[in-house]
Amino acid sequence: MKPPAACAGDVVDTVSPCSTVNHLRWDLSAQQIRALTTQLIEQTKCVYDRVGAQDFEDVSYESTLKALADVEVTYTVQRNILDFPQHVSPNKDIRAASTEADKKLSEFDVEMSMRQDVYQRVVWLQEKIPKDSLKPEAARYLERLIKLGRRNGLHLPQDTQEKIKNIKKRLSLLCIDFNKNLNEDTTFLPFTREELGGLPEDFLNSLEKTEDGKLKVTLKYPHYFPLLKKCHVPETRRLLEEAFNCRCKEENCAILKELVSLRAQKSNLLGFRTHADYVLEMNMAKTSQTVATFLDELARKLKPLGEQERAVILELKEAECAKRGLPFDGRIHAWDMRYYMNQVEETRYRVDQNLLKEYFPMQVVTRGLLAIYQELLGLTFTLEEGAAAWHEDVRLYSVRDAASGEEIGKFYLDLYPREGKYGHAACFGLQPGCLRQDGSRQLAIAAMVANFTKPTPDVPSLLQHDEVETYFHEFGHVMHQLCSQAEFAMFSGTHVERDFVEAPSQMLENWVWEKEPLMRMSQHYRTGGEAPEDLLEKLIKSRQANAGLFNLRQIVLAKVDQVLHTQTDVDPAEEYARLCQEILGVPATPGTNMPATFGHLAGGYDAQYYGYLWSEVYSMDMFHTRFKQEGVLSPKVGMDYRTSILRPGGSEDASTMLKQFLGRDPKQDAFLLSKGLQVEGCEPPAC
């Protein structure tokens, strides 16, 4: 049997004739997105057809494994050009076209992942080729393709494969719609200035007005979090918290129900007891029982701390009600949590958040953050003036290795909210750093997308300290994308085990709790003066404030996720309410449906939200074992970190990387101490 004729043209050249370095482009119209989506599918399918049509005796590394790896590189870049605009484009038509492109391409991804003809030739190659003839990463790639083939059911009967394929296609569409609904939500609540009592003037002045002069408060983060923390009018907080947790309630509730059911069906067809067990097979945790034990033990250890913190909050609430002449009901409501947790910081630790943010103007934080990352990781960043992007607010930086001067990547910063934009903070890998078809290395390119408070004509963007922490976290993901030197796109950047992926960026959050880094990224926005030492010392001491309640809430979210993916016929809203009461000791607001707003459930974290806590075990161990001992800003430790943790991407197991960096197997001690818990034989970490 002859292979089909060679595919016409090269995907990169025909779909996106850009520079030889940055293949990304952001000037496509909705019509072009639609046309190029069809073209990309046709050209990529041609490669799969050629691989799948080979006679078995013709199967080789070059014709099979390398062909699949090469097309993955070009396909990934072109796909991102077409489907990333749905998250960031200011043009609604382009967002819609990009969303449709994502749906088509997701369906195509399913089709290609279910190619039994290709799978059979990959299996044949593994049996035919001596394992030691492949480089370690190529051998890992071969093993991973076979593992993924089995996880797609390609070893099962044809009718079962068809069922799995149809379920996968439907799941892709549902996930896209779930998050699109949240991104496109434009709900706002109108309030008078009196109803927004307690909020600072700069916040109030930044709000748009309704026709009758009321102030518009949206459900986006830069409005939601400040109001929940600072507004002293309980009814205003209640209305906003209720609206926030009712976003897309009806449509996403229906989507979530179908998602959970289809995931369970697919996992059962593949021989797994639950969807969680199917997902976790590829993670460090391996089984749902391991995750359940981890969460239960942590909840048990944190419970006394949570009880103490709730008692403090009730005291504060009683005093507040007496002061403002409000009735005290003796209970903590969901809309009370952030307000009184903020009061704990301000009264018990004397941290004035409004004063603090005056020392964190965006420009100063960005300058300090970039300087710290450059020094720590041995890099040089250069702003590319006038670079093309998807919006005028976006900035593009070039990244070079400081020692060699070699360019290793670029990153975009898109930091302010816009209508229709992705509503959280995230890092998007756009161009994987890996080897291209000719053996040259492709530049890694990533985008950090966030929603920090916009500047006004009078006041620059001022960041809350937790926003500075978010900035450091997400930029940590950017560095993971750019410093990775994997050979295969499949292992580039953050393509590591999902319950390890947060560890590298979580570790870098520690810098916003250390005095020297804080001094370097703070300066008063009016006077230019340094942040007072006592203000920073109070902030650093407040790190463990509310640690019990904050982490118990993380456990609630992780358990909701696990329950939905280990049990059938569970009502998500009821389950969330039960766990809030049982673990957090604070009831969910009646009538709300938080899981319908929980983007992680449809954003690749299904059965894996526990990973935020799980990976913190490793992030805290890395920080306290190396950086805290040898120097928080030590370039030597930073380079060890870049080499051992960031450089491999997913080309090695996380456990191997950790052992190399730590010099031993990981331990939980630093993690537990960071939560304010006692560990036998260990001193608490110095603040």
UniProtKB/Swiss-Prot annotation:
Q: Where does Zn(2+) bind?
A: 473, 477, 480
Cofactor(s) demanded: Zn(2+)
GO cellular component annotations of the record: mitochondrial intermembrane space
> Where is coiled-coil annotated?
none
Q: Using the record's annotations, give every residue carrying the modification Phosphotyrosine.
A: 278
The record's catalysed reaction(s) read: Preferential cleavage of bonds with hydrophobic residues at P1, P2 and P3' and a small residue at P1' in substrates of 5 to 15 residues
Q: Which GO terms describe its molecular function?
A: metal ion binding; metalloendopeptidase activity; peptidase activity; peptide binding
**The keyword Electron transport belongs to this UniProt entry's keyword annotation:** no
Phosphoserine: which positions carry it? 16, 172
Q: Where is it chiefly localized?
A: cytoplasm
Determine the domain of life of the protein's source.
Eukaryota
Family annotation (Pfam families): Peptidase_M3 (PF01432)
Q: Which residues form the active site?
A: 474
CDD domains assigned to the protein according to its UniProt record, in alphabetical order: M3A_TOP (cd06455)
Question: Where is the PTM N6-acetyllysine found along the chain?
Answer: 257, 538
Q: In which tissues is it expressed?
A: Expressed abundantly in the testis. It is also found in the liver, lung and kidney.
* Entry EC number(s): 3.4.24.15
Q: Would you kindly state one Gene Ontology biological process term found in this protein's UniProt entry?
A: peptide catabolic process
Alphabetical keyword list: Acetylation, Cytoplasm, Hydrolase, Metal-binding, Metalloprotease, Phosphoprotein, Protease, Zinc
Identify the PANTHER family for this entry: PROTEASE M3 THIMET OLIGOPEPTIDASE-RELATED, THIMET OLIGOPEPTIDASE
Q: Which family does it belong to?
A: Belongs to the peptidase M3 family.
Stated role: Involved in the metabolism of neuropeptides under 20 amino acid residues long. Involved in cytoplasmic peptide degradation. Able to degrade the amyloid-beta precursor protein and generate amyloidogenic fragments. Also acts as a regulator of cannabinoid signaling pathway by mediating degradation of hemopressin, an antagonist peptide of the cannabinoid receptor CNR1.
How this chain assembles, per its entry, is: Monomer.
Protein name, entry field: Thimet oligopeptidase
What species was this sequence derived from?
A: Rattus norvegicus (Rat)
Question: Which gene name belongs to this protein?
Answer: Thop1
